[in-house]
A protein has these predicted regions:
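Alpha-helical transmembrane segments of multi-pass membrane proteins
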Residues: 1-769
């Protein structure tokens, strides 16, 4: 394996590994989100575990390759690792799918009741057990392949090409093929197909080394396994679904671009719609939805035009239609749910006097594009769960509420929030007051109806809004609306003593934080509130982090960094520590900024999840372009010091870019407000591409510097491991803490500080040479 013709199979293998890794990663994330209730907190843990285990796998693959005295044992390991990775991926999907039942058999504190949310401990254990083995095997393939490539061809070009080929593979797998395959194929079959591609490419690498005739039995066995494996995967998919939903009559399991929807029958409960594993829709109208809708509608003297967000699965649309309205605009969180409800839930009652428009698009995208005349409403009912996820939170932010009220200054907002009639914990108060204070904007009146939930309406203080039970009953009778459940409980829910008590409790929170697009604090507060019920230690961790101010974090980080640099300078170990630390720090910064961009993109563009896949792909293309550009730079680099100077320049550029990311996002959304939707999407693609390029250019430069003291292939694998190690911590902290607690602006500022500290660290290495 010494010429370009013989290296072609290895190049194809690197691309195939990237493709399989990208696809399996997306499939696993989707499966884990189903059992983790769709929480982005779980996404951070998932990505963190993947990157951490991947770092170990890449380092292990490079280390084993360096110990081999010839290429033969290293090449023989390639198809073996591909087979192990495929098997691990299939086992991981089965484990994740059956995990709710498995945790139900564990003793405390791991025991989980059916329908109960996973806590941080459960998510961590499940991710380690399922994601870590797959990530280790996947990245061990890359570490092995890049080591082979480095031994075949000396110089910086192979390293840059390896990085670019892996990024291109991830683009195909994670940014495109994953979305196509997960919609057309079940997760097990999609994973098996991707793994088979990598395994065939691995066989080609082995055949180029040992000869096709020697590999003939293995090739025949692989062909037979692929032919027999696809029907086996289909059967395994059906079996695991039946085991997961044992006790239910499973009617359908449907994947949309956003979520997994299971429709099942269960005795007296009737037909239940599970969205990402959580019961979210039923055949009959739910009591809380019934109360929310009527409480909201009776706060307006003549609610003719109504905006309804969510609630079709719990009967909200039917309840709104019982009032004498002229127009109802209905939006779902996931537009794919509209067709599922039409298919499996009872049809809507036709009311000629009320024009019910079912919108199959995202609400916020509609608010940007619809004519002003179509955005005039009297009442906006948020028949949504509390903002447990960032996806839900984007409907509770100041910007969303402002856009809804732009053409309807007298509009009434109605929410169903966590609450009781008798007790409000500090976590519950923090969450409720943040949402209500954001909606009231300091100028609107808030009326409430305490029950098993806190029903709240926020509107103009015209004297019509009321919390009096007799007034509500009189209005209901005047409008000729039949609501038997409402009339039976309204006197209890609007008991003056209960209402006054809850108002006093809410007033305990002085100056609640405003929930905004760029600082989704309500999402963070809801995480604390939800975890307090299922995972008290995890809730205490998040609540404790909330007490730490960002300036304090920056001060302590800079102080510790200065101490470390002094120790490194005194020991004269900068050449050992500086560059790996810089790459790990770059991985951290890149992951934080990329998650911030993804979050901002999701807020503005909505549920165009195929485009989010392309956005991730744009980052990977940027990585590839940056790696290739660095390879060209290194062709004209004759001294190690020149490579270090170029790495310093890349770090400075990353620090400056971090500072302007919030302004770029704000400017992009402002400029594109009256432009076609594709312009906004293209702007985010470009932003992600530039970020990827700034990160990708550093990997070959760092590898070239480290190659002065160790084998180039091992140096490349080590730098890749350092990048993944930093990215793992960035994934966990960005999704769980940095972005929701400190906002995109605060997270970007911290990233800039980290980048400039890394500049100082690498400059120290230059001074010691």
């Amino acid at each position: 394996m010494a010429n370009g013709h013989q290296s072609l199979p290895l190049q194809l293998f690197i691309v195939a590994v990237g493709l399989a890794s990208g696809l399996v990663q997306v499939v696993l994330v989707r499966q884990l989100l189903i059992v983790c209730s769709g929480s982005e907190l779980a996404v951070g843990v998932i990505l963190g575990i993947w990157l951490l285990a991947g770092a170990a796998g890449s380092w292990w693959g490079g280390r084993r390759a360096r110990r081999d005295t010839s290429l033969s044992p290293t090449v023989a390991r390639v198809p073996f690792l591909a087979a192990v990775c495929t098997a691990m991926g299939l086992a991981a999907i089965c484990l994740v799918r059956l995990s709710p039942d498995l945790f139900g058999k564990f003793p405390e504190p791991l025991f989980v009741m059916p329908g109960e949310m996973f806590g941080l401990l459960h998510v961590l254990i499940l991710c380690i057990a399922s994601v870590a083995p797959v990530a280790f095997a996947a990245e061990a393939q890359f570490g092995t392949a890049v080591s082979i490539y480095g031994r075949m061809q000396e110089g910086p070009d192979p390293v840059a090409r390896s990085y670019a080929m892996d990024a291109i593979g991830h683009l195909i797998g994670g940014g495109a093929a994953a979305y196509v395959l997960t919609l057309w194929l079940d997760p097990l079959t999609a994973t098996f197909c991707a793994g088979s591609i990598a395994l065939m490419a691995g066989m080609a690498v082995a055949a180029s080394r040992f000869g096709a005739s020697r590999m003939k039995p293995q090739i025949i066995a692989l062909t037979a396994a692929v032919i027999l494996g696809i029907p086996l995967m289909l059967a395994l998919h059906t079996l695991t679904l039946q085991l997961r939903w044992s006790g239910y009559d499973l009617m359908a399991s449907i994947d949309t671009l956003h979520s997994n929807v299971v429709v099942a029958e269960h005795g007296v409960k009737g037909r239940v719609f599970f969205i990402n594993g959580q019961p979210s829709g039923y055949t009959e109208t739910m009591p809380d939805t019934h109360l929310l809708v009527h409480f909201a509608m009776l706060q307006h003297p003549d609610p003719q035009n109504v905006l309804l967000i969510g609630g079709r699965g719990t009967g909200a649309l039917e309840e709104v239609a019982t009032h004498p309205v002229s127009r109802v605009d209905y939006f779902e969180l996931d537009p794919g749910l509209v067709d599922i409800y039409d298919r499996f839930r009872r049809p809507l009652v036709d009311r000629p006097e009320a024009a019910i428009t079912v919108h199959r698009q995202d609400l916020r995208a509609y608010l940007r594009s619809a004519p002003d005349g179509e955005r005039r409403w009297d009442v906006a009912i948020f028949a949504l769960p509390p903002p447990l996820t960032a996806v839900l939170n984007r409907h509770y932010t100041r910007e969303c509420l402002r856009d809804i009220a732009q053409q309807s200054p007298e509009i009434i907002f109605a929410f169903g929030l966590p609450g009781t009639q008798t007790y409000y914990s500090q976590d519950m108060l923090n969450l409720d007051t943040s949402i209500l204070y954001t909606a009231a904007a300091g100028k609107r009146k808030v009326v409430i109806m305490p029950g098993y939930s806190l029903f709240a309406a926020v509107g103009p203080d015209t004297g019509y809004m009321s919390e009096d039970a007799s007034t509500m009953l009189q209005r209901l009778e005047e409008r000729g609306v039949a609501a038997s459940y409402w009339t039976s409980v309204i006197s209890d829910h609007l008991d003056p003593m209960n209402v006054d008590y809850v108002h006093r409790e809410l007033q305990r929170i002085q100056s609640p934080p405003i929930n905004t697009d760029l600082q989704p604090i309500a999402y963070y507060l809801n995480q604390i509130y939800a975890l307090r019920q299922f995972d008290a230690p995890g809730a205490r961790v998040l609540a404790g982090l909330k007490q730490i101010a960002l300036p304090a974090i920056i001060r302590w980080f800079v102080l510790i960094a200065l101490v470390v640099m002094c120790v490194v300078a005194w020991l004269r170990k900068a050449d050992v520590v500086a560059v790996p630390t810089a790459i790990a720090g770059t991985g951290f910064v890149a992951m934080v900024l990329q998650l911030a961009v993804l979050y901002a993109f999701q807020i503005q563009v909505g549920y165009v999840y195929s485009l989010i896949g392309v956005l991730t792909g744009a980052f990977m293309v940027g990585l590839a372009a940056g790696g290739l550009f660095a390879g060209r730079l290194l062709r004209h680099t004759t001294e190690p010091q020149q490579a270090l100077l170029k790495l310093l320049g890349a770090l400075i550029a990353l620090g400056l870019f971090s500072l302007v990311v919030p302004a770029l996002i704000t400017g992009l959304t402002g400029v594109s407000a009256h432009l076609p939707g594709w312009f906004l999407a293209a702007g985010f693609f470009l932003l992600s591409f530039v970020l990827g390029g700034m990160v990708g250019v550093q990997f070959p430069l760092a590898t070239e510097i480290q190659a002065q003291t160790e084998h180039r292939g091992f140096a490349a694998a080590s730098m890749y491991a350092a990048d993944l190690l930093g990215g793992s911590s960035g994934a966990v902290l960005a999704g769980a803490v940095l972005v929701p607690l400190y906002g995109i602006g605060g997270a970007s500022l911290l990233c800039a500080v980290i980048a400039f500290v890394l500049v100082a660290m690498c400059a120290l290495q230059g001074c010691q040479r």
